[in-house]
């Protein structure tokens, strides 16, 4: 499923590299890579800090997308298998 979304986003890469969906997708890939790294290296605090920063950036982009276009937000959440944002 992730590979399929990667392929579809790669095809659109030339014209949409700066789109919110592509940015969230690339942050999600980085998050998954860092998570697997931290499972092996639990005390790598610099990587933990980097992971928290990327999580914050992705969360801000998802908040922006949910406010601007709820349908695109729901589709992206479903494609990338991410939990929805907590509402206050």
Swiss-Prot record:
Keyword Manganese in record: no
Superkingdom of origin: Eukaryota
GO molecular function: structural constituent of ribosome
Keywords: Chloroplast, Plastid, Ribonucleoprotein, Ribosomal protein
One example of a Gene Ontology biological process annotation: translation
Main location as per UniProt: plastid
PROSITE patterns per UniProt: RIBOSOMAL_S15
Cellular component aspect of the GO annotation: chloroplast; ribonucleoprotein complex; ribosome
Gene3D superfamilies: S15/NS1, RNA-binding (1.10.287.10)
Subcellular location: Plastid, Chloroplast
Pfam families documented for this protein: Ribosomal_S15 (PF00312)
Subunit composition and interactions: Part of the 30S ribosomal subunit.
Protein family membership: Belongs to the universal ribosomal protein uS15 family.
Name listed for the protein in its UniProt record: Small ribosomal subunit protein uS15c
Organism encoding this protein: Aethionema cordifolium
Gene behind the chain: rps15
């Amino acid at each position: 499923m992730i590979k399929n979304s990667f392929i579809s986003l790669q095809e659109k890469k030339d014209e949409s590299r700066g789109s919110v969906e592509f940015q969230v997708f690339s942050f999600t890939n980085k998050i998954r890579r860092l998570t697997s790294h931290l499972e092996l290296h639990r005390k790598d605090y610099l990587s933990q800090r980097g992971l928290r920063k990327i999580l914050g950036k992705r969360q801000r982009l998802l908040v922006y997308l949910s406010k601007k276009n709820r349908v695109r937000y729901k589709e992206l959440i479903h494609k990338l298998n991410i939990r929805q944002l907590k509402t206050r």
